């Protein structure tokens, strides 16, 4: 009874996360994060490394990483934004920034697969469910070649 009670406590109320559309997953699997591929990526990688290391507090590191995520998105560098987001220490900030990346990626069919990358990094089933619904709906609207 105790085992069943523990299982129910942990699993009831958690939404079942719908899968991403298979076509979106297939396209996302062709994307790779390689911040060493170009000078801009190298600078972003270096900035992310500097922001996430050292003797600063977690809040300070998270603030620097959050700023880099926003900067990366402004530059159209979803790869760097995803890398920086998963390094955030605060779970709520991480989930929020990953959802921000997913929403930003969903604005354009060409960047939509980066939203799948962001959703994969999410740990909160509720946030991940919202992201999957958004990404799947947007994927269905995108023209196919």
Regions found by a protein language model. Give the residues of each.
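Non-catalytic tandem-repeat scaffold regions and their flanking low-complexity/translocation tails
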Residues: 2-145
């Amino acid at each position: 009874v105790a085992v069943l009670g523990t299982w129910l406590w942990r699993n009831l109320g958690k939404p079942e996360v719908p899968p991403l559309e298979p076509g979106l997953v297939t396209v996302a699997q062709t994307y790779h994060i390689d911040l060493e591929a170009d000078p801009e990526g190298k600078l972003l990688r270096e900035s992310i490394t500097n922001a996430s290391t050292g003797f600063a507090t977690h809040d300070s590191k998270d603030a620097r990483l959050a700023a880099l995520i926003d900067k990366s998105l402004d530059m159209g560098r979803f790869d760097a934004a995803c890398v920086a987001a998963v390094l955030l220490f605060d779970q709520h900030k991480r989930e929020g920034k990953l959802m921000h990346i997913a929403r930003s990626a969903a604005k354009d069919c060409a960047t939509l697969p980066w939203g799948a990358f962001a959703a994969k990094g999410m740990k909160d089933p509720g946030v991940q469910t919202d992201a999957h619904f958004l990404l799947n709906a947007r994927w269905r609207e995108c023209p196919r070649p």
